[in-house]
Amino acid sequence: AMKPMKKLTALALACALGLSACAGPGGASSHSAPRQDFTSVPPGAGSTQEGAPAQAMRYRSMWFSYLEWPMLDTSSAEAFTASVDTVLDHCVSLGLNCITVQVRPFADATYESGLFPWSHVVTGTQGQAPGFDPLEIMVEEAHERGLRLEAWLNPYRVRNSATNAELSAENPATAMLKTGDAIQYNGAITYNPASKKAQQLIVDGVREIVENYDVDGIHFDDYFYPTTDVAFDAASYAQYQTGGGTMSLTDWRRENVNQLVRAVHAAVKETDPEVVFGISPQGNMENNYDKQFIDVEAWLTEDGYIDYICPQIYFGFDNSTYPYAETVEAWSDLIENDVQLYIGLSPYKIGTEDTYAGSGRWEWANSGDILARQVDTARQAEHYKGFSLFRYDSVFQPQSGVKAAVQEEIDSLKQVL
């Protein structure tokens, strides 16, 4: 299928040649506001007030997760468009310029896919089609408002223990469970990161999105290996050793993820060099390395992995273990290549007790300008290029008990944007 943007180019050409296509209804798309290109901001630009124009170019995104999808009315294309417009208008009103939409939470698709079944978050049942293409509508409506849209997917997760949605018969994981290319563990199902077949499916799934939709980016979050348990992939590791492999289990796991990340990056760039590929790992570096088995340092020193990193620095300034300012600095210091640094921020903590923060456990309950100060602080970091907010509900549909606190935080955040 042709991307809307590519269709537009053809339309523009037709207009230039004076062909009748100009009169067609497709011409309406020319009202689209220009989208910003965040990939070209020079390092350190705009860390002062004089750099205000550069600040405006910074990445400012909102995560819209599968937990938010139920708020969208999927009864018809018209109803869906109206509910999407509300979401996007909220993002614009906050001064954001991007939305990161979860399109593959559970080895499924919130768009027309030849590889994955329709997601249960769209119609309530995996494999059931809504009768229109939600992603196509979201991309078009976002671009009309000058918002970029990134497609966020979970590469390995098929289902977690909390998801009761039945796998549809056509879900590729159904057959792959029988061959060890997908693994059932602790009530959850995950694609086997060591499986070449699973890896290829994930890469093909990314390529399909970039080919068929005018998305501005592909986004992975912090879920990679679901466990540290040696039993999880013991069969695959034994096979690797039998074949003469000498890496330790943990290094081998990290290399499995590295292979996937490199392959996804290559597929994205081959399909459309303008599309970015970024990953949002945990803010806790040790967890990334030892529990998720991701080698972030490789991604931030060698080329060919990612375009941006967006660590989830969901910590306040007074967090005993990971104080915000020092954690941002530590992440910035890791970067030795051209990878852009975005900071994942945690409005979901506003007005609540931060249980594991030690001396900072009441910080989010007692302050009204943490997010604003976090953005200001991040701007001092050498590689900082923007932020993302987790998540839409926490900002625009907060629990009644924290509504006033959220409003206060968002008002102060707007002051620094």
Predicted regions, residues:
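Active-site-adjacent "subsite" loops/lids of carbohydrate-active enzymes
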Residues: 53-81, 150-151, 156-212, 360-364
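Polysaccharide-binding and catalytic clefts of secreted carbohydrate-active enzymes
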Residues: 145, 173-302, 314-315
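Aromatic-lined carbohydrate-binding/catalytic grooves of carbohydrate-active enzymes
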Residues: 94-130
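Substrate-binding cleft of secreted/luminal carbohydrate-active enzymes
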Residues: 303-322, 330-331, 337-417
